Regions:
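Preference for well-ordered, secondary-structure-rich cores of eukaryotic proteins
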Residues: 106, 113-114, 126, 133, ...
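C-terminal anion-handling pockets and recognition modules
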Residues: 16-21, 27-28, 144, 151-220
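Structural signal for hydrophobic/aromatic residues that build the beta-strand cores
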Residues: 7, 24-25, 68, 114-117, ...
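Extended, low-complexity cationic-aromatic segments
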Residues: 2-99, 209-210
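RNase H-like polynucleotidyl transferase catalytic core
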Residues: 53, 114-118, 132-153, 166
Length: 220
């Protein structure tokens, strides 16, 4: 199993090794909370307000598909990639937003290891050719392994902040995008480092599970 082989081949990587990795992924951010059930919390003495009540919305209220990356220095640039991004569009994201992230954090690209999953857009010929021409190294990634990617914690953090930091849902997609940009800054460098520091534990969990999927991503 590729997941098990990958975890074994990286089980001796130290946190210093993982510090070099830029983890990347896309995620869908809904205008009205989650994809399925919606939950709200209030203190016993609190009165029910607009934050606690989910409005009924025709057609689900809409969502934005975004790309970003997670580095040891903090959250990378976040970009709205649309719902039909192809390999050409993804390549533009790498050329623009990935490189801007490296530049903004002062990262030495020759020491960077770039991670992406095996989505066909990511593994297309034009993307592979461009990556092969870059000074940074590409990290081979096992299939179906979101539990190994610490950026999933970053996305969960961002979505929690979007839900809890405002009294009411955004009134438009433009406002949702504005909130995403603002919420990015609520995720600290220290939190990003905590997520990346979990990589040895993630590898160990996959080995213990003999390559099967783990629940570690819920337990940091």
């Amino acid at each position: 199993m590729k997941r098990l082989q990958w975890a074994k081949s990286h089980q001796h990587w130290t946190v210093d090794d993982w510090k070099r990795v830029i983890f990347s992924d896309e995620t869908k951010v809904n205008r009205f909370a989650s994809d399925g059930k919606a939950y709200a919390w209030k203190l016993p003495h609190e009165e029910l307000n607009s934050r606690h009540v989910q409005q009924t919305v025709k057609h689900g209220g809409g969502n934005i598909m975004v790309w970003s990356c997670l580095t040891w220095e903090g959250v990378g640039w976040i970009v709205d990639v649309g719902h039909r991004m192809n390999s050409e569009g993804y390549l533009e994201v790498l050329k623009d937003d990935l490189l801007k992230t490296m530049e903004s954090y002062g990262l030495d690209s020759s020491k960077v290891v770039f991670q992406q999953d095996n989505d066909p857009k990511h593994t297309s010929k034009i993307v592979k050719e461009w990556i092969n021409q870059q000074p940074f190294e590409a990290l081979e990634w096992p299939p179906q392994s979101p539990d190994l990617n610490p950026i999933e914690h970053m996305w969960a953090h961002l979505k929690r902040e979007l839900f809890h930091s405002y009294e009411a849902p955004p009134t438009s997609m433009h406002e949702l995008w504005e909130r995403i940009g603002q919420t990015r800054y609520a995720i600290s460098k220290e939190e990003c480092q905590k997520y990346i520091e979990s990589m040895p534990k993630r590898c160990a969990a996959v080995i213990k599970a003999k390559g099967r999927w783990t629940k570690l991503f819920c337990q940091i």
